[in-house]
Amino acid sequence: MKYVLVSGGVISGIGKGVIASSTGLLLKTLGLKVTSIKIDPYMNIDAGTMSPLEHGEVFVLNDGGEVDLDLGNYERYLNVTLTHDNNITTGKVYSNVIQKERRGDYLGKTVQIVPHVTNEIQDWVERVARIPVDQSGEEPDVCIVELGGTVGDIESAAFVEAMRQFQFRVGHENFVSIHVSLVPVINGEQKTKPTQQAIRDLRSLGITPDLIACRCKQPLEKSVIDKISLFCHVGPEQVLAVHDVSSTYHVPQLLEDKLLEYLKIRFALDKISVSRELALAGENMWSSWKHLTQGYDHLFKKVTIVLVGKYTHLQDSYISVIKALEHSAMRCGRKLDLQWVEASHLEASTNTSDPLSYHKAWHLVCSANGILVPGGFGSRGVEGMIAAAKWARENNTPYLGICLGMQVAVIEFARSVCGIEGAFSEEFDKECENNVVVYMPEIDKDKLGGTMRLGLRPTFFQPNSEWSKLRKLHKMVDEVLERHRHRYEINPAFVSRLEQGGISFIGKDERGERMEIIEKRDHPYFVGVQYHPEYLSKPLKPSPPIFGLVAASAGLLDEFIQSGEEVEWSNFSHFNAESALADMNDSVEVTEEATVVTIS
């Protein structure tokens, strides 16, 4: 087993997750089996009870694990299925150590950070690294370990010490350290001092980086690479320049030459036995990835989607939704133009308190090609979401509601079409007589952590739903598996009345009691799903519900359905520079003075 540690210095949020994912992707192109572990040095057991504004999106795994958003990156890049154990937190480690102490596993020893906590961390990494994560069902060859936060923070001290010891446990020949640092530009000059200091800090803790990934605005100058090489005691070939690019999908190509060449030699990868089947799959994956990124740069026609959410101040709160929209836009041959609307700005009260924000928000909603309302918790902004759903329904604007987004669409329909006065959700008004959304009876109302309906669960399309556009995108299957994260459901007592009003519950759970999918028949695309389709979307395999929204917004959905094509990429024949240039030529406006290219 080979291990790659990815750590960060200077500042957090520097792109360690993308670099870790890109490293894994490059190794997979060689036919190797790769897994990933994310270490989060916070005391929380998991990310389940954390606000998205505090830590970004809570990503949900097949087994119901509520984990850091970086595990979403790993799954998207590496096409693997991880478990909650692939996310290590201080809370989990300490909980395990305390349980062992209570059982007497330490035989009366004084329990300390070293060796007991550090050993627990190392044992965890070694155990999880051997769990199969792909379709081969075989033990991985390489494990990428990302250490969250910034080296030097007090929270990560035990994990850094554990990794220092771990490099000797597994052997130098099986362990590579990549340190990600920032190279800022001051007065037009790339500065290396922050990187030098970060490397000194890491060395003082016992870890010597093998590769230094330098995040920078522009490509690193040769003199800067030489300076980092000199003062950080690495060869110039061990300094990786990771400059800003148009899309994170380009990062693997930035790293390909230096990183892959170094790992091949250091890990003696040519000695690892790789089946012809996996080697060919790796080659095909890399070819597809390059075609995808090449085509992305030549997209000119836009599709405008407005996201009406509660946590728009931190876009990482919706990172999987953003990526899923990008995947679908690329599949449609469109450049995604994503506009953000704070849901509360659509509410009538905002017209009084902040009319500028109110009118700006409504202008974005009214001019969008499509509307997406994602999941969320709490009452803030809910009336704004309901207003957005009403606009989409009445004006034939393509709409997708995810989790809460489906619930607000049902509330709006109940009020406006079915005449259910005061229809609302038990989440926001427990005393309301007409709550069309209610608490699920099996859910613990007192304990928040890990008590929702979580993980991969089946949804069954109902009889007589053959007309459904969403079902057609799923190739008319009877059942789909999607990841869930919710406490509330559509009130079964109102289902019949809602269906009489004209909304169809085309998907239900295995018992036929829980409403999973809504769709409006006489609409270009009006769909709500109780699950979170964004969690399973991949660059080469977009999510059908989200693809449906983007395709309908681009005016391509009916044509796509009639063509019988798969949502998953089968080839890239229509996604290349030539077709993109044709699109661009279609949008060239000729005037007497000049030819103006309008990106529209």
Curated annotation (Swiss-Prot):
The keyword Repressor does not apply. It comes from the Eukaryota. Keywords: ATP-binding, Glutamine amidotransferase, Ligase, Nucleotide-binding, Pyrimidine biosynthesis. The active site is at 403 (for gatase activity), 532 (for gatase activity), 534 (for gatase activity). Pfam families: CTP_synth_N (PF06418), GATase (PF00117). Residues 304-570 form the Glutamine amidotransferase type-1 domain. This is CTP synthase. It comes from Schizosaccharomyces pombe (strain 972 / ATCC 24843) (Fission yeast).
